[in-house]
Amino acid sequence: MKKRVGILTSGGDCPGLNATIRGVAKALYARMGDNVEIVGILNGYHGLINGEYREMCEDDFRGILTLGGTILGTKRTPFKLMRVVEDDKVDKVAAMKKTYKDAKLDCLLCLGGNGTHKTANLLSQEGLNIIGLPKTIDNDIYGTDVTFGFHTAVDIATEVIDRIHTTAGSHSRVMCIEIMGNKAGWLTLYLSLIHI
């Protein structure tokens, strides 16, 4: 019996999104062969709310390993309260459940950060089969040691800082560097330990 697996990316961009999507697809095809169909939910939860999805095939996952961004698209617009009907009069939870049902999904993989996982948890409580894939350069998702995107962010920031050192030295200057991380300091901590 074929299983239909949906996958979405939500929230901000981070390194490794397409590599993760590709890895999931390759694992599903390797394990299940012709018994799996992958459905790409376009533009994150907005696509799930608005019924924006498409059937995907193995060719869709070729050549994306090193591409930045996400082939599925994403939206970062936060929802004030997922269960509250806002000015647009759309019951977001009901709309997402409808798309899940209309797409005949057996499971939905949600690749994202804290906000993505809060919504994924809500959908799980609503009875949908959900798998959360933690993605954020902040490395601050509860219950994980390392999230997708974190180590790449460390590597890239390290390279940038190393280059700034030479510029600062050439001009006898001190430079201040602001590092992302939202409310978590993991990225800054790792970078400071590398540059001691």
Give, region by region, the residue ranges found by the protein language model.
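A cross-family phosphate/adenosyl-ligand binding-site feature
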Residues: 1-10, 20-104, 115
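Gly/Ser/Thr-rich loops at beta-strand to alpha-helix junctions
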Residues: 11-15, 111-118, 181-185
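Short Gly/Thr/Asp-enriched flexible loops that form oxyanion-binding sites at enzyme active sites
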Residues: 20-24, 114-128, 188
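Glycine-rich beta-alpha junction loops
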Residues: 42-46, 137, 179-184
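Short, acidic/small-residue loops that bind anionic groups at enzyme active sites
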Residues: 123-147, 151-156
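Polyanion-binding loop/helix "lid" in catalytic or ligand-binding cores
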Residues: 158-190
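Conserved small/polar residues in nucleotide/adenosyl-binding loops
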Residues: 194-196
